[in-house]
């Protein structure tokens, strides 16, 4: 895997944050966590949701569409996705986007 350069990482983080805010506005039960991982040399994204929403087709379509977009733009450096930390764990320092955090910090 090729190391993500600083400017590319910042652009990727901005894109992820904007997407995450839109997703939690649409799917109010969703929480999105993300952070850069030195180990994986890319950004890790965790989509956190209650089990009853695991079969929401619109949600999965929107998440997969974003994943495809990121793969086209960043190739091997594209972020890695997981659901409810099934594939990897994020640290306590991960950014968290959810309705509560977005509402309390709109700036």
Task: List PLM regions with ranges.
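Short secondary-structure junctions
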Residues: 20-31, 71-75
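Charged, low-complexity intrinsically disordered segments and flexible loops
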Residues: 103-107
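A short amphipathic beta-strand at an alpha->beta junction
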Residues: 68-100
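Short edge beta-strands and adjacent turn/loop segments
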Residues: 24-46
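N-terminal presequence-like segments and adjacent domain-start helices
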Residues: 1-14
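A short interface-forming secondary-structure element
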Residues: 42-64
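Short, internal active-site loops enriched in acidic
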Residues: 38-41, 48-50, 85-89
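Well-ordered, non-membrane alpha-helical segments in soluble/globular domains
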Residues: 13-19, 56-68
